[in-house]
Amino acid sequence: MSANWKTTGKTTGELSFEISQDEIKKSLDKAFGRVKKSLRVPGFRKGHVSRVIFNQYYGEEALYEDALNFALPEAYSAAVKETGIKAVGQPQIVPVSMGKNKAWEMKAIVTVEPEVELGQYTEIEVPKQNTRVYQKDIDAELTKRQEQNAEMVLKNDKAENGDTVTIDYVGTVDGVEFDGGSAQNYSLELGSNTFIPGFEDQLVGHGAGEEVDVVVTFPEDYGAKDLAGKEAHFATKIHEVKAKQLPELDDEFAKDVDDSVETLDELKEKIKAELKSEKEEAAKAAIQEAAITTAVKNATVEEIPDVMIQEDVDNQLNQYLGDMQRQGIDPQTYFKLTNTTEDQLRSQLSANAAERVKTNLVLEAIVAKEGFEASKEEIDAEIKDLADNYNMSEKAVRNALSDEMLAHDINVRKAMDLITDSAKQVAKAKLEEGSEEDK
């Protein structure tokens, strides 16, 4: 194939290429095979017209459009590969010449990825992370586990934040009851902020047997539009008040909450190890984010084409909705419950799309510069991990994702690891001093 690339802008150009006579013949055969079944020519049974007779009646040119549709995808892909351009989006392809017994000449208006000039991406200075576990961290986790295993006991005193009250309530707006505004024997933890702002606060200081007229105003962005911004009265009766009774911190408690330990000291050591692991993971994530952000900032990227930004938003949206469905959540039900729309979600995803695209371009440029290449073993391991994570068969993963796509993800992770692992943690003061010098 003879292909030629001519740059016409920072991210646009013209790709000239040919479709060979051999490929044209194959595509004409496919096109004839498709139309033959429905052909009607006087003197011939339907679907039994020869190619010669077809050409006599209609001319071979009648097959050109279908033949071109068959031939173009492969010919265009081959031209892109031959010229080495990084095409994005859909090209605008225009036939230049389509004659008999010669190659067909094509011209495509193509958008390509912008050029990337890398800056420093290794040994980047990032804020030092503290992964030390303090006694207060362990104590807080123990308290959390006490609360999770607390018993609820009746109290005769007035309700306080943290107590749970059992109530009946009837809500009205302008003296009229509304749907969903009434309940009986409802358990509500005061301070949980599960009800309309102000509702729970007005029950604090009241005890069992009391009736309280709770007056609140629905938020302006409340899901039910007919109630948004309106004042409501809730005739509320408190049946009982219960308080949390925390279990004693002793060896028995330790064994109750974790059957892998025998004593409270062992539980504390296990909690310390778990918190240490969590802090180290959080530290690595923070280092990675800071280092990659700086590496991207250090790079120079030409103007990003709109088509790349829209493709990113489409991919993010499809992934978001796909994750919902895999969790058994119907997207339309989700939008209804959250009082949002797909367009609003798309708008949210668009906010950082350009930065996401720039980050991907920089990471891909690092992959190319470092010469990262995923091995067959790495691709096989990636397929196994994806199959396990999404509860799919490995065959299904292979059918859904090409080796090229999998290798791309593996290599990008290698670039991210290179940036992260080579980063240097320094004190915040030193970083601020360096930023002052850069001004």
Curated annotation (Swiss-Prot):
Its predominant location is cytoplasm
Query: Listed GO cellular component terms?
Result: cytoplasm
Q: Which residues form the PPIase FKBP-type domain?
A: 162-247
**Residue ranges crossing the lipid bilayer per the database entry:** none
Keyword Cell division in record: yes
Its keywords, alphabetically, are: Cell cycle, Cell division, Chaperone, Cytoplasm, Isomerase, Rotamase
What is the recorded name of this protein?
Trigger factor
Species annotation? Lactobacillus delbrueckii subsp. bulgaricus (strain ATCC 11842 / DSM 20081 / BCRC 10696 / JCM 1002 / NBRC 13953 / NCIMB 11778 / NCTC 12712 / WDCM 00102 / Lb 14)
| Lineage, highest ranks first | Bacteria, Bacillati, Bacillota, Bacilli, Lactobacillales
